[in-house]
Amino acid sequence: MSVAGPTLVNVTDTRGTFALTDMPGVRLQDADFTVVDVETTGWSPGAAGITEIGAVRVRGGEVIAEFTSLVNPGTPVPAPITELTGISDPMLALAPPAAAVLPGLLAFAEGSVLTAHNAPFDLAFLTAACAAAGLGWPGFEILDTLKLARHLVSTPDEVPDCKLATLADYFGAPVQPSHRALADARATATVLWHLLGRLADREVYTLGELAAWLAEKDAEAAAARTGVAAVTARRWPLGVARAPRARTPQWLAGPRRWLARVPRLPWRRGRGIR
């Protein structure tokens, strides 16, 4: 059985794309987004490998190119993963390794905003694979559609959750996610464009405005919940707490030598901390 290497399909003229240095002022409808998805043998890049990469490059809501390749992870595919994705060891026997696929992907995505649903997962595998292959990781701008959806889609009023399958169904994506890389990337591309369409009501029109808006929303979300607070002195951590109000008196009521070691105690009250 022969397995083709990386495949480019539906390629059209991509002249007019923007370099990263030009991106902040680029309007959302004019920017290039490369939506990527990876399938893997497990959940951690330290113990698992990539089995498939799919990417869709979109501009103005239109697909201008697609990239897809099976990837030989160098290790057997666990049975539960084969059951989930349909990707098996025989399918990957003659597939290229990640080191042979990644240069094509990086070139495909050059000058675009790299986008994924739950981006930290995909990026962890891609960056680890690049490091293992001795490839430098470009300075991509990154957009996570999961994070964007959590700011723009009401749950549970509109949808019960912001999983890719839920959002793809809600927005009527012509291709539904199926735990195959290209299908999932296509579904994410549809979700992305519907989410970007909601930003006009927030007066967000450019990539720079989107970055600023996301930073503001992330800060608001962090302040609104009681989370993990790390309190540090100049060179060493004083402590970490999930209940800062309860823990701070304990820190400050300790031996006087602790207080003598604290030159400054920076803090800021958040709405989630009372």
How does the language model describe each region?
Residues 75-80, 162-163:
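Short, glycine/polar-rich helix-capping loops at beta-to-alpha or helix-loop-helix junctions
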